[in-house]
Amino acid sequence: MIKKKVLTQEQISEKLDYLRKQRDGLIVGDYRNYLYKLYMYLKERCSETEDGSCNPYPWQMLVALGRDDLHKSYLGYTYCDDLEALDYIKMQGYGKDKKIFITKEIDF
């Protein structure tokens, strides 16, 4: 069984505050941009299916992020874990049977 990242409400609030500051230019970095791009990509992919889920390949997520370092394919799933911990997506299953669902609109 895979252990999912679980954040307290306080940790979620702090992380969202950080992401909003990064969005507003108060903090320099690309972390927020990567999460946002991945969320938008997943939202588009999920909208194409009847059950509202998607299961993109890791390299597809990297391309959506604008990254060409395909040897770092784990990054897509790392960012998915972060989005899930913040309650923006839900992941079910594993491997080729994994399903990703959008659970709420992005607000950072």
Which residues make up each language-model segment?
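Short intrinsically disordered terminal tails
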Residues: 1-10, 84, 105-108
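Alpha-helix boundary/N-cap detector
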Residues: 3, 7-10, 14, 33, ...
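Short alpha-helical segments that sit at the start of domains
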Residues: 10-50
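Short acidic, hydrophobic short linear motifs in intrinsically disordered regions
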Residues: 48-65
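Short amphipathic alpha-helical interaction segments
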Residues: 69-85
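A short, conserved structural fragment
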Residues: 84-94
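Short, cationic-aromatic polyanion-contact patches
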Residues: 94-108
